[in-house]
From Swiss-Prot:
HAMAP family: Lumazine_synth (MF_00178). The keyword Ribosomal protein does not apply. Its EC number is 2.5.1.78. This is 6,7-dimethyl-8-ribityllumazine synthase. GO terms for biological process: riboflavin biosynthetic process. The active site is at 93 (proton donor). It holds the Pfam family DMRL_synthase. GO terms for molecular function: 6,7-dimethyl-8-ribityllumazine synthase activity. It comes from Synechococcus sp. (strain CC9311).
Length: 160
């Protein structure tokens, strides 16, 4: 029986794209900061001159799938991380954005074979979003760790 796991080794060669929604940037900027901290602590060059990391900003979470798809199809990246924050309001807009963003991001991973990390917070209040982006913990860190694990795992799977 074979067991396949991400090992967090040889990360010096990994190329990562991060796609960040500008809407609710009070939250998404904190998620990005946590994500970059995790990547840096695991040996990924996160400096402005980095050849390992690119960051793309999009208007909102609805646009995350399209840009993620273009980056994944480029062949330059082993993993794409999406970061967004959709906060429930008084209209059905929340449900539409969350459904389309999540389905679209999942489709990108399936269609391209490139792991795409779903780092979109879906909360009822701004307070809940802020708690998940740094007040209590920073899920951006977790999304960075997931990306590193998936990049490593994909390298050891048969056919890669």
């Amino acid at each position: 029986m074979a067991t396949f796991e991400g090992r967090f080794t040889d990360l010096g060669q990994v190329r990562i794209a991060v796609v960040v929604a500008r809407f609710n940037d009070l939250v998404t900027a904190k998620l990005l900061s946590g994500c970059l901290d995790c990547l840096s602590r695991h040996g990924v060059d996160t400096t402005a001159e980095s050849s390992q990391l690119d960051v793309a900003w999009v208007p909102g979470s609805f646009e995350l799938p399209l840009v993620s798809q273009n980056l994944a199809r480029s062949g330059l990246y082993q993993v794409v991380i999406t970061l967004g924050a959709v906060i429930r309001g008084d209209t059905p807009h929340f449900d539409v954005v969350v459904a389309e963003a999540s389905k679209g991001i999942a489709a990108v991973a399936r269609d391209t074979g490139v792991p795409v990390i779903f780092g979109v917070l879906t909360t009822d209040t701004m307070q809940q979003a802020l708690e998940r982006a740094g007040i209590k913990s920073n899920l951006g860190w977790s999304y960075g760790l997931e990306a590193l694990e998936m990049a490593s795992l994909m390298k050891v799977l048969p056919g890669h």
